[in-house]
């Protein structure tokens, strides 16, 4: 099977399993990246070469986080076990055990510095929604105007992680910025999607990440601060302001309460 045929079949395999749009595009994007790295038919890639890719290239050279390395590993497993129908020795390609640590959140001063450095109103609005409503980056690119409920001050999140739908809070600041962005900065094109690129195409995860890194450097923040850090700040704020774990779990779209409980250790509260 050629790599082109592999990608075509992999695409169909994911569609048959009803993967969310975010997962589908992430798997396809990183799948192409993996294929480009080896530069030969994936059927010819050895287990030792896969180990070297995961644990030397991704971990040592690129210094990716354990979560990111495991994501690549999951794609490799899907590629071989499902698409190529080829057994893979998982003991030789183990998932990295994630180190338990405290989520990084930003201080009020750091947040103020960061937002003051963002000189593009569209991206400032995007970052405010991540901070004020706790949306994942993939959920932001899928936002439609019809998802914004200004009467009940909430946002409908379609196709969240695991294809789950939910409602989350729409802050007054986010609503004001959305209205300003829509009326003054967004081009009048025929698309219900809120955020578009400069070419009037749907916004992508990659573009947002690149812009975030640019403004993070401009603000002088630690390189470990990511777009997802804004979501961590949102959850921590909820807990510090009296929200219950169940409420936070639903607003964040967590499938397991244990994910929500990790924010208790970050929040400035007495238990």
Q: Can you annotate each of these PLM segments?
A:
Residues 1-271:
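Conserved catalytic core of the tyrosine transesterase superfamily
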